[in-house]
Regions:
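Boundary at the C-terminal end of the N-terminal hydrophobic targeting segment
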Residues: 4-7
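N-terminal capping segments
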Residues: 10-129
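...with weaker cross-activation on analogous glycine-rich loops/strands in unrelated enzymes
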Residues: 105-183
Length: 183
């Protein structure tokens, strides 16, 4: 996955560790994670929003050696921070439902976002960067699909919508998770 956590830490299969018990268990974890988010909180792409994600919403519990995600503290937020936090919370729910934890401490530590982490740097930096970053991360984790084609989408898929054809700094769009068919 990155220098701090290899794909082997998260996966023993080509598809990724988020689906060895079956695809249905992953999508159930994602739906459960989504139900724990609240409405509101504000949409803002700012230093404050980055700080809320990295320092208030995502914490490491040294006693349990597992992450703690405080979803209500991630406010304000923005599209990639909300999608990434949903991904992390869903991974946590999925992992806790397994007979024994599958996601290693090392992998969790790599997945937790850090304030000041640059786009393209580590899993959070991949997810936050414009371009295919979140798609690559979701694919490597086996955590669903990330794409643009509405006709192929199903609830729980990560999607890029309103994406421009520009490259680099001028590239823009919106990340979301399809919640249900039909809008």
């Amino acid at each position: 996955l990155c220098s701090a956590a290899s794909a082997a830490d998260l996966s023993s299969t080509g598809r990724g560790s988020a689906v060895p018990s079956g695809e249905a268990s992953w999508y159930q974890a994602l739906r459960t994670g989504l139900s724990q988010f609240r409405n509101g909180g504000g949409y803002e792409t700012s230093r404050e929003a980055m700080q809320a994600l990295a320092e208030k919403a995502c914490r490491w519990d040294p006693r349990t050696r597992r992450p703690v995600f405080l979803l209500r503290n991630a406010a304000p937020s923005f599209c990639s921070s909300a999608c990434y936090l949903l991904l992390l919370k869903s991974l946590q729910i999925w992992d806790s439902a397994q007979p024994r934890p599958v996601i290693s401490e090392r992998a969790w530590l790599a997945l937790i976002p850090r304030f000041g982490q640059h786009d393209g740097e580590g899993p959070w930096g991949w997810a936050n960067a414009n371009g295919p970053g979140l798609a690559v991360l979701v694919h490597r984790l086996g955590a669903g699909i990330n794409f643009e084609d509405w006709r192929k989408a199903r609830p729980g898929d990560f999607m890029k919508i309103f994406w421009t054809d520009r490259i680099g700094r001028r590239e823009s769009g919106h990340l979301t998770v399809l919640v249900k068919d039909g809008g």
